[in-house]
């Protein structure tokens, strides 16, 4: 059995968990998230904990149990606390601003870039060079942050571009004559 799957997922007070076949739904103050659990994993609900047991005779059931436990744990954290991603814009003239649920980016191209945030993700720009994204869905917020970063990834010589706030950009030395 996977080491990750051995640990149960604790359900805090105020969180409602429903298991309908292989569909698991977690409801909390930040919203509701649902996920289809792999058939190789059996989910058991106790009073305030979820346990994940791999089914016998199914290939990679141990790995699937660990994966399911990690994903459900992220769902529980998401509906209780939520997740945030911070992006920084580094470069002369690089700007960001929110227009409703659209992030308007000026990244040195001849045209402005407008990225519409999907349902479940909110954003704010405390300054022109900073974007803060918030969501209950860890995978969705990570994908949205990666999509915004992909418009202008940090380049290795000056470090200009869109980067995560905790990202360390390794810079190269310029070519010498």
UniProtKB/Swiss-Prot annotation:
<dbReference type="InterPro" id="IPR019906">
    <property type="entry name" value="Ribosomal_uL6_bac-type"/>
</dbReference>
<dbReference type="GO" id="GO:0002181">
    <property type="term" value="P:cytoplasmic translation"/>
</dbReference>
<comment type="similarity">
    <text>Belongs to the universal ribosomal protein uL6 family.</text>
</comment>
<keyword id="KW-0694">RNA-binding</keyword>
<dbReference type="InterPro" id="IPR036789">
    <property type="entry name" value="Ribosomal_uL6-like_a/b-dom_sf"/>
</dbReference>
<dbReference type="InterPro" id="IPR002358">
    <property type="entry name" value="Ribosomal_uL6_CS"/>
</dbReference>
<comment type="function">
    <text>This protein binds to the 23S rRNA, and is important in its secondary structure. It is located near the subunit interface in the base of the L7/L12 stalk, and near the tRNA binding site of the peptidyltransferase center.</text>
</comment>
<dbReference type="Pfam" id="PF00347">
    <property type="entry name" value="Ribosomal_L6"/>
</dbReference>
<dbReference type="InterPro" id="IPR000702">
    <property type="entry name" value="Ribosomal_uL6-like"/>
</dbReference>
<dbReference type="GO" id="GO:0003735">
    <property type="term" value="F:structural constituent of ribosome"/>
</dbReference>
<comment type="subunit">
    <text>Part of the 50S ribosomal subunit.</text>
</comment>
<dbReference type="InterPro" id="IPR020040">
    <property type="entry name" value="Ribosomal_uL6_a/b-dom"/>
</dbReference>
<keyword id="KW-0687">Ribonucleoprotein</keyword>
<dbReference type="GO" id="GO:0022625">
    <property type="term" value="C:cytosolic large ribosomal subunit"/>
</dbReference>
<keyword id="KW-0689">Ribosomal protein</keyword>
<protein>
    <recommendedName>
        <fullName>Large ribosomal subunit protein uL6</fullName>
    </recommendedName>
</protein>
<dbReference type="GO" id="GO:0019843">
    <property type="term" value="F:rRNA binding"/>
</dbReference>
<keyword id="KW-0699">rRNA-binding</keyword>
């Amino acid at each position: 059995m996977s080491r990750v799957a051995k640990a149960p997922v604790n359900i805090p007070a105020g969180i409602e968990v429903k298991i309908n076949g292989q569909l698991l739904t977690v409801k909390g103050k930040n919203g509701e998230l649902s996920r289809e659990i792999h058939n190789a994993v059996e989910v058991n609900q106790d009073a305030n904990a979820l346990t994940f047991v791999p089914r016998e005779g199914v290939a990679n059931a141990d790995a699937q149990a660990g994966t399911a436990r990690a994903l459900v744990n992220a769902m529980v954290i998401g509906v209780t606390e939520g997740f945030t991603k911070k992006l920084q814009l580094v470069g002369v003239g690089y700007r960001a601003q929110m227009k409703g649920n659209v992030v308007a980016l000026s990244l040195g191209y001849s045209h402005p870039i407008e990225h519409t945030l999907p349902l479940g993700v909110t954003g704010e720009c405390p300054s022109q060079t900073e974007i803060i994204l918030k969501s209950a869905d860890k995978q969705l917020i990570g994908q949205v942050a990666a999509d915004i970063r992909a418009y202008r990834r940090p380049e290795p010589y000056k470090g200009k571009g869109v980067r995560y706030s905790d990202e360390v950009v390794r810079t190269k030395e310029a070519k010498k004559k």
